[in-house]
Amino acid sequence: MITVSEVSSYSSSSSNFASLSRLNHKSSSRLRSSSLYKGSFFSVSTKTRRNTCKAKSWNLGLVINSRSSEASVFDPLGINPDETSGLSSIWESFVSLLSPSFESSSGNRRDKPSSGRGVAAAIEDSSIDFGDFFKGPLPGKFLKLLGFLALSRLGIYIPLGGVNREAFVGNLDQNSILSTLDTFSGGGIGRLGICSLGIVPFINAQIVFQLLAQVYPKLQDLQKKEGEAGRKKILQYTRYASVGFAIVQAIGQVFYLRPYVNDFSTEWVVSSVTLLTLGSVLTTYIGERISDLKLGNGTSLLIFTSIISYLPASFGRTTAEALQEGNYTGLGTIVVSFLLLVLGIVYVQEAERKIPLNYASRYTSKAGGLQKSAYLPFKVNSAGVMPIIFSTSSLALPATLARFTGISALKNVAFALTPGGSFYLPTNILLIAFFNYYYTFLQLDPDDVSEQLKRQGASIPLVRPGKSTALFIKTVLGRISVLGSAFLAVLAAGPAVVEQITHLTAFRGFAGTSVLILVGCATDTARKVQAEIISQKYKNIEFYELDKYDP
């Protein structure tokens, strides 16, 4: 690795003599005391030998050489075969005091990759300017993202015909589970838009296939052993199943609207079910196109947009209720709780467990020891917002089936599972814990991780490769999933506790789970944007610029 050292005196540069003499014994007596090298556009870390501990970055855009244009031979070590006069040597020594000297740990070309690693480290550690957002394909991707999100919101404002919307909205405020689903749809259910089903049928289809993968070994092999091709097949099956779920939920919603329909006929039912199904398919398609942009998960971003659009109305109702009742203390408690909730979510979302790794063939260029920066990161909440989305959709399923079938037992179950019901909180916590544990091991299979580490020549200290490593990773993930489940359970139970303290229920539709979705999607998108910018910086760097050294 090429380092940059600051020389404090003329004699300090004599330490280069021993290392360079091994390369060329014949020219060792002709070495200059302080040689200036040709520098390509590298970003390399520096360290001072005396009284300097802070690292700093050097951006070298000029070709520096101790001689004039006569030096046309590739000479990266500064070994000049010509003798120089004493006056020239004194002058170059004076220049070396004013500029840093470049020292290479070895003179062969095998050190070039370590120089490239210096560039990579400098790129990853460098700050991102605001102007970087307007370079490369990133602006075009953001425009496409905004266009897709605007198109998904447009379907919310195209209503179904023949429905008394005012009467339906009045009944919607009294139904907690529909209010929660209305949050995920961005007010689409209340507005009776053709895209009011949103992404919920696709999420239900995902839940069903993930559960079926544990029952049918063929699906599990298709998901894990066949790689990307198998996952594409499961995604295709999920799309087909989402259409079926959309038809079922559309029929249930249409029959639920029967008391509010002016002319409830067969033609109206068929047309409404068709429009709602097509709206759900369109939303699912938009979500997949958003995922293809690699700026975040399409499903999460659609729900993120819906919650953001629902936030002003929800907060306005809460404020109006507090002002009407004179409950200023309760309003302040909600605001403080919201801020603390956001801080806690950000803290937990960024927390991770780092497991150190040892590589059999990865050494540092100077010390010759194992690289210390290699580790395996496991996030505390690695499942993200998906367990909450799955849990909410599962709790809404009995109410949908009850509206469709009219069975009294399902109505009782749906009533018990609504927010504020007797079984809502414990069932929600159990479902969140189950989906969090399941989704954690679905994303990170300990056997697969152990096999990949073994192929890469990596091992965990004091743990044998193979089954012992898989068991160790499984234990770590199990403990982390417990912490993540406890965190998600606090989010699920927190709003209910705040409601009991403040006696304000209008804020129920915007719960802690919604805040987690907002923060999770925002941090994930910010991370993807940062990765995109770093990728563009890598594309603009040439690690091997040997052409300009040719005579």
Curated annotation (Swiss-Prot):
Transit peptide residues according to the UniProt entry: 1-67
Predominant location: plastid
GO biological process: one example: protein transport
InterPro entries, sorted: SecY, SecY/SEC61-alpha, SecY_CS, SecY_dom_sf
Cellular component aspect of the GO annotation: chloroplast; chloroplast thylakoid membrane
Transmembrane segment boundaries: 142-162, 192-212, 241-261, 268-288, 295-315, 328-348, 382-402, 415-435, 482-502, 503-523
Subcellular location as annotated: Plastid, Chloroplast thylakoid membrane
Keywords carried by this UniProt record: Chloroplast, Membrane, Plastid, Protein transport, Thylakoid, Transit peptide, Translocation, Transmembrane, Transmembrane helix, Transport
Disruption phenotype: Seedling lethal. Albino seedlings with yellow and translucent (glassy) lateral organs when grown heterotrophically.
Membrane topology value: Multi-pass membrane protein
Keyword NADP in record: no
Family annotation (Pfam families): SecY (PF00344)
Further remark: Cannot substitute for SCY2.
PANTHER family: SECY/SEC61-ALPHA FAMILY MEMBER
Assembly information from the UniProt record: Part of the Sec protein translocation apparatus. Interacts with SECE1, ALB3 and probably with SECA1.
Function: Involved in protein export. Probably interacts with other proteins to allow the translocation of proteins across the chloroplast thylakoid membranes. Required for normal greening during embryogenesis. Central subunit of the protein translocation channel SecYE. Consists of two halves formed by TMs 1-5 and 6-10. These two domains form a lateral gate at the front which open onto the bilayer between TMs 2 and 7, and are clamped together by SecE at the back.
NCBIfam families: 3a0501s007
Family indicated by similarity: Belongs to the SecY/SEC61-alpha family.
Name recorded for this polypeptide: Preprotein translocase subunit SCY1, chloroplastic
